[in-house]
Amino acid sequence: LFGFLIPLLPHIIGAIPQVIGAIR
């Protein structure tokens, strides 16, 4: 399971600023 999630971490982390920007 983690072998599938780890490659996605950069995408998830990269999307965080966009989510924050959308909330503001």
UniProtKB/Swiss-Prot annotation:
Principal localisation: secreted
The entry's keywords: Antibiotic, Antimicrobial, Cytolysis, Hemolysis, Secreted, Toxin
Expression tissues: Expressed by the skin glands.
GO cellular component: extracellular region
Any GO MF annotation of the entry: toxin activity
Subcellular location: Secreted
Biological-process GO terms, alphabetical: defense response to bacterium; killing of cells of another organism
Domain of life: Eukaryota
Family, per entry: Belongs to the grammistin family. Group 1 subfamily.
Subunit structure: Exists as aggregates of 3-4 molecules.
Protein name from the UniProt record: Grammistin Gs G
Organism in which the protein naturally occurs: Grammistes sexlineatus
